């Protein structure tokens, strides 16, 4: 098991797929990293040398915000919006959709399970 950015990445998968197990690295960034370091996309993690794994680790640490730092940054951005009491911050605070989606029906993912209203029959 190779450990990159505090995450154990699977050894039997291709490098591009394995890097996406790190929060903050999707397929596009994984391909960018592999291209920059000259690693073939079809190679598997178990076939990489320790030096190549170290190169990947250093490239991610130097250029990308990942894992805990990224989660903290996103949480701080949301907290800043809530402290400003702007429209987006109020929507976050109330647990409603932030980007203009309708809420009369739908929005169940954001609002949670439907709460029954006493006395209301169909």
Swiss-Prot record:
Record flagged with keyword Ribosomal protein: yes
GO CC field: cytosol; small ribosomal subunit
Sequence intervals crossing the membrane: none
A GO biological process held by the record: translation
Record GO terms (molecular function): rRNA binding; structural constituent of ribosome; tRNA binding
Alphabetized InterPro entries for the sequence: Rbsml_uS13_C, Ribosomal_uS13, Ribosomal_uS13-like_H2TH, Ribosomal_uS13_bac-type, Ribosomal_uS13_CS
Keywords, in A-Z order: Ribonucleoprotein, Ribosomal protein, RNA-binding, rRNA-binding, tRNA-binding
Subunit: Part of the 30S ribosomal subunit. Forms a loose heterodimer with protein S19. Forms two bridges to the 50S subunit in the 70S ribosome.
Family membership noted in the UniProt record: Belongs to the universal ribosomal protein uS13 family.
Known role: Located at the top of the head of the 30S subunit, it contacts several helices of the 16S rRNA. In the 70S ribosome it contacts the 23S rRNA (bridge B1a) and protein L5 of the 50S subunit (bridge B1b), connecting the 2 subunits; these bridges are implicated in subunit movement. Contacts the tRNAs in the A and P-sites.
Protein name, as recorded: Small ribosomal subunit protein uS13
Lineage: Bacteria, Pseudomonadati, Pseudomonadota, Alphaproteobacteria, Sphingomonadales
Gene: rpsM
């Amino acid at each position: 098991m190779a450990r990159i950015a505090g995450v154990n990445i699977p050894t039997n998968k291709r490098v591009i797929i394995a890097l996406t197990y790190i929060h903050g690295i999707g397929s596009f960034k994984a391909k960018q990293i592999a291209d920059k370091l000259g690693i073939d996309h079809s190679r598997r993690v178990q076939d990489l040398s320790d030096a190549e794994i170290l190169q990947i680790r250093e490239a991610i640490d130097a250029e990308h915000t990942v894992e805990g730092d990224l989660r903290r940054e996103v949480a701080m951005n949301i907290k800043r919006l809530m402290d400003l009491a702007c429209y987006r911050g109020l929507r976050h605070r109330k647990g409603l959709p932030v980007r203009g989606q309708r809420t009369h029906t739908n929005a169940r993912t954001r609002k949670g399970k439907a709460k029954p209203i006493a006395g209301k029959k169909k």
